[in-house]
């Protein structure tokens, strides 16, 4: 239904029928960003009242943004996700709903419905649904709480007693700060897999801190401001973790109320961190709290920050520059030659971030892209992930990628058998 030929708006419908009874399962229900070529569907192909389960692979808006619409239209089934995604769900959707034109009363009603319908589940355990369908969640390593999903359907034939489908959701890169690496997938008949970076191999991630350090040293020498558009969920926390490691004497401002709220939740969910982050935290080196880090919560403080002189680092949303406080900062600083803008995440077609990277908008500030900060697996990582399946799937469907990415990854997967 969504993200078939683009990167945003993920939504998949699975229909199963046995003994005259049908089960409708939705996997993700996301919003579309920018000018992604795929026109978002205006109506769900089955009545939301008839959808039994909604699985959420993680809490990014391009995977959950239409959940309020689904409930508005009558959905009352179970929302299934990991425990960490459950904790992140309402803060992310509250922010999205606040910009949707809904009144406070409507938002409060929807939040209560979402909270009542959603359930957090453990990873690596098998749970049962209707009609003897089962599911198991695995760590996807994309952001905190992200998972890929194995759905197993009864299939009483001579060839097999079951049919297994995996939805990858968004797969993370290996060696991502804070997060454990993605799990290897089990055997399946059908694999529905993301392909965001199916045409690209990331630079060596071990060198990215040095790349960031070099750019920040330049800003320090130029006395300029470094603007980093960053997603509130995932990327901001990753940046704070590495800025703490770099330990430069430059003030760092997080100018995003949502990112600050999400960072507080990340801190409370330390049991889901990777080994390195846990060890640092146990030694008293909290990755999201260091000298020179400042939180900008109120709009008044945001307006004051617009007047700051460098050197300084400002992290603000939205990550694709489609809205949020980053727009005020860019308006203020794009035409100042000593300033820098660092993009550390995917920029969808038609977004301001993509247009800046491609040079469509003339600016005096320097534009940089650190693709090694992507929270998505690159081409080789995706291939290796598929190759780690004990037995190759009978079918692979690539989604969540632009045309070039899907075509190139298809070719590579065919070459690798």
What are these regions (language model features)?
Residues 4-6, 13-77, 81-116, 173-181, ...:
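Pre-active-site segment of Zn-dependent metallo-hydrolases
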Residues 174-255, 340-345, 355-416:
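Cap/insert and terminal regions of metallo-dependent hydrolase folds
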Residues 28, 58-59, 89, 142, ...:
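Divalent metal-coordination and catalytic microenvironments
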Residues 90-146, 271-309:
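Metallo-beta-lactamase
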Residues 29-30, 52, 162-168, 172-174, ...:
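Acidic/glycine-enriched edge-of-secondary-structure segments
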Residues 3-4, 29-32, 84, 143, ...:
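Active-site metal-binding loops of divalent metal-dependent hydrolases
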Residues 1-49, 120-180, 302-313, 325, ...:
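Core dinuclear metal-dependent hydrolase active-site scaffold
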Residues 213-344, 349-352:
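Hard-cation-handling environments
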């Amino acid at each position: 239904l969504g993200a078939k030929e683009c990167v945003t708006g993920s939504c998949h419908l699975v229909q199963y029928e046995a003994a005259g009874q049908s089960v409708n399962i939705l996997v993700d229900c996301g919003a579309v960003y920018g000018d992604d070529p795929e026109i978002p569907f205006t109506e769900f192909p089955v009545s939301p009242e008839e959808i039994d389960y909604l699985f959420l692979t993680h809490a990014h808006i391009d995977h959950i943004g239409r959940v309020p619409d689904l409930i508005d239209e009558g959905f009352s089934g179970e929302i299934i996700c990991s425990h960490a995604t459950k904790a992140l769900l309402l803060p992310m959707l509250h922010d999205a709903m606040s910009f949707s034109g809904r009144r406070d009363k409507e938002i409060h009603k929807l939040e209560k419905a979402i909270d009542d319908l959603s359930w957090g589940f453990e990873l690596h355990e098998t749970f049962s649904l209707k009609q003897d369908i089962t599911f198991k969640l695995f760590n996807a390593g994309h952001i905190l709480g992200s998972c890929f999903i194995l759905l197993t359907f009864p299939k009483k034939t001579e060839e097999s007693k079951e049919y297994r489908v995996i939805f990858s959701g968004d797969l993370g890169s290996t060696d991502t700060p804070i997060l454990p690496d993605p799990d290897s997938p089990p055997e399946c008949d059908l694999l529905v897999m993301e392909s965001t970076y199916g045409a690209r191999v990331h630079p060596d991630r071990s060198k990215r801190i040095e790349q960031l350090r070099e750019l920040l040293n330049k800003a320090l020498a130029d006395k300029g401001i470094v603007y980093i558009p960053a997603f509130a969920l995932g990327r901001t926390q990753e940046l704070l973790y590495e800025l703490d490691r770099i330990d430069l004497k430059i003030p760092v401002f997080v100018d995003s109320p949502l990112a600050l709220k999400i960072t507080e939740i990340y801190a409370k969910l330390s049991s889901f961190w990777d080994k390195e982050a846990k060890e640092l935290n146990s030694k008293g080196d909290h990755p999201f709290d260091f000298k020179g880090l400042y939180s900008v919560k109120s709009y008044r403080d945001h307006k004051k920050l617009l007047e700051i002189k460098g050197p300084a680092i400002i992290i603000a949303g939205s990550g694709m520059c489609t809205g949020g406080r980053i727009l005020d900062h860019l308006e203020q600083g794009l035409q100042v030659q000593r300033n820098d803008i660092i993009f550390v995440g995917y920029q969808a077609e038609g977004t301001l971030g993509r247009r800046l990277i491609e040079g469509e908008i003339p600016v005096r500030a320097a534009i940089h892209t650190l693709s090694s900060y992507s929270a998505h697996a690159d081409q080789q990582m995706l291939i290796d992930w598929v190759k780690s399946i004990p037995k190759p799937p009978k079918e692979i469907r690539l989604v969540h990628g632009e045309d070039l990415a899907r075509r190139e990854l298809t070719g590579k997967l065919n070459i690798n058998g």
